[in-house]
Regions:
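Asp-based, Mg2+/Mn2+-dependent phosphohydrolase catalytic module
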Residues: 1-2, 125, 129, 139, ...
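Small/polar loops that bind or transfer phosphate-bearing groups
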Residues: 15, 138-139
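Phosphate/oxyanion-binding active-site loops and adjacent basic polyanion-contact surfaces
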Residues: 19-23, 120, 198-206
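Short, surface-exposed acidic
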Residues: 32-47, 92-105, 159-167, 219
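A metal-dependent, Asp-based hydrolase signature
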Residues: 48-112
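Short, acidic loop-to-helix structural element flanking the phosphoryl-transfer center
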Residues: 73-82, 112-138, 144, 148
């Protein structure tokens, strides 16, 4: 029986908090230069605004056409966007929304993402090696080359040549965040107990990738692994796949509870559990 595994990478196989520190520092350095403020002042604002985001995790998220499509508290990359917006507001800088969005997302995010370090979660090598017998793909919102570089680094640390089979099975820029209300065969949203807003399900670009990788296999044979339920797992769960939430200290309580309670949901913190779930 063909078993398909769709694996997110950043934050799922890596320690997002540790690898994201250079991204965070570089982003704040650029904000200081752009606003003309002292770095110390920017750092103070960042600490204050980050605390606000973490204190009210339901209120902040990745906005797509004015709607939250992913929570912001989950990792330093997502947290930086509302923090940076608050810093620009406080400085009265880049007030135009189009200009601000291009600056924060298309320029500063992309440029500083390249500064990330390579810090893997415990047992990432063992977990990835165990997935070779399956039809395993890495599907990420990031660009392909940085993720391939991380896999090559993990290969060198774990066992050289262990992940050569994965070389051409990395798909980047998956647009998991792009929500469009045009897939009428799917519900528009999920309601998670404990979360006041809806989780938006109709993500056509991500769905087309999942459908292509699935081929003619039933959804029951597809397992999707990610660290953010709303971004990585909500859509495949609705489609009928099994989903694995690789939780961390910043995973929202409502995501943990919903996945743990669902018959096709699997909540883990040890990546070595993935193989057994695929073989269920």
């Amino acid at each position: 029986m063909r078993r398909i595994v769709v694996l997110d990478f950043d934050g799922t196989m890596t320690d997002a908090e540790a690898e994201g520190r250079p991204f965070w520092e570089g982003y704040l350095e650029d904000l200081a230069a752009l606003t003309g403020r002292e770095r110390r002042e920017i750092d103070e604002m960042a600490r204050r605004f980050e605390a606000e985001v973490l204190a009210s995790p339901q209120e902040y998220g990745w906005l797509w056409k004015g709607r939250i499509v992913c929570p912001a508290a989950v990792d330093p990359y997502q947290r930086m966007i509302p923090v940076a917006r608050k810093i620009l507001d406080a400085c009265g800088a880049f007030k135009g929304e189009d200009e601000r969005a291009r600056l924060l997302d298309a320029v500063l995010f992309k440029y500083n993402y390249r500064k990330t370090e390579r810090v893997f979660r415990p047992y990432a090598g063992e977990a990835l090696a165990s997935l070779e017998p399956f039809d395993t793909w890495v599907v990420t919102n990031a660009h392909v080359e940085p993720v391939k570089a991380k896999i090559a680094d993990l290969d060198a640390r774990y066992k050289r040549g262990a992940f050569s089979w994965l070389g051409e099975k990395v798909i980047g820029r998956a647009n998991k965040h792009v929500v469009e209300d045009r897939e009428l065969d799917l519900p528009a949203e999920l309601r998670l107990p404990g979360l006041a807003r809806p989780v938006l399900v109709r993500r056509p670009h991500y769905r087309s990738l999942l459908e292509r990788l699935r081929g003619d296999a039933p959804w029951e044979q597809v397992t999707v692994v990610g660290d953010i339920f709303e971004l990585d797992l909500a859509l495949p769960l609705v489609l009928g796949a099994h989903v694995v939430l690789a939780a961390n200290a910043f995973t929202p309580t409502w995501e943990r509870a919903y996945v743990a309670a669902h018959e096709r949901g699997h909540l883990i913190e040890d990546l070595r559990e993935i193989e057994g779930i695929v073989l269920r």
